[in-house]
Amino acid sequence: MSIEKPFFGDDSNRGVSINGGRYVQYNVYGNLFEVSKKYVPPLRPIGRGASGIVCAAWNSETGEEVAIKKIGNAFGNIIDAKRTLREIKLLKHMDHDNVIAIIDIIRPPQPDNFNDVHIVYELMDTDLHHIIRSNQPLTDDHSRFFLYQLLRGLKYVHSANVLHRDLKPSNLLLNANCDLKIGDFGLARTKSETDFMTEYVVTRWYRAPELLLNCSEYTAAIDIWSVGCILGEIMTREPLFPGRDYVQQLRLITELIGSPDDSSLGFLRSDNARRYVRQLPQYPRQNFAARFPNMSVNAVDLLQKMLVFDPNRRITVDEALCHPYLAPLHEYNEEPVCVRPFHFDFEQPSLTEENIKELIYRESVKFNP
């Protein structure tokens, strides 16, 4: 099983030596990359995201091609600065085939005078969003293999006491062998944190009902809802719930899975939230087999168990891995968990941008003593 490897073109920019030859500066589409000299030219632009531009480069010391993400003006505001630090700390803690790995943080030449952060990751060829939008044929075997790897990685993440909170196709990275890795942990939280809703600015299409309804306490079930949305999108090649706003988002959800009855609203602590849901237009549950005619019976059954309004009744990651749809791939002994739970104990309310800059510099020194 394979997918076509995209071609991003070459960049003839050979760079300028700076800081006594220890670093090389490249101009990539007007973005200045300052990288250690071990990353040899050319730098090849391969992507641009909300947090920065990404280039491929060769590590001359290891002979590996890597992805370098430049986060420009990384300390311009406290929210973005925390997001960068959070991802660095989390990915350093994790070690799993289906979670993207940080290989290096390029050490800034001056510890107290830098504004950009350059993070080096494993290089992947593409992401699931691009594959879904492409003309690449996707079979049931593709779907099963993608889903299995996503759940296998998510089992590890959840076992580390972490909720990803931003699972969507563009955050699932792939190579030409169809190996999948979960990326972008900038919005992740531990299960015990209480300030969950702060800074929550991601696309609403993959958000669970409890998030749309501002439920103050939520669980790992929010990630399972997102996985269900992704599974449906792989099969239909279009988003399941492309809502323009919160109101339409809830309507699209209830049009498919049916309006919840009172027994499905127990997770809502707020009387106002329950009243709001009850006054929404009522929809019967659609026939999933008719709505998803290209999905196998087992795939449809698993999708239905993921897209459940009440998070307490939603299938868990461990239950999903044991589902008959994944039986050809499921091996309990090959689905490791994280040995130590992760704690965001470095995140104090009094943390300033300068504090975060110092912490990120320290992380870069660990990679480059």
Curated annotation (Swiss-Prot):
Any Pfam family matching the protein: Pkinase
Disulfide bonds: none
Superkingdom of origin organism: Eukaryota
Any one GO molecular function term: MAP kinase activity
Motif (TXY): 198-200
Post-translational modification: Dually phosphorylated on Thr-198 and Tyr-200, which activates the enzyme.
Activity regulation, per record: Activated by threonine and tyrosine phosphorylation.
Modified residues (Phosphothreonine): T198, T203
Gene Ontology, cellular component aspect: cytosol
Residues annotated as domain Protein kinase: 40-326
Record family assignment: Belongs to the protein kinase superfamily. CMGC Ser/Thr protein kinase family. MAP kinase subfamily.
Record's protein name: Mitogen-activated protein kinase 11
Organism: Arabidopsis thaliana (Mouse-ear cress)
Species classification: Eukaryota, Viridiplantae, Streptophyta, Embryophyta, Tracheophyta
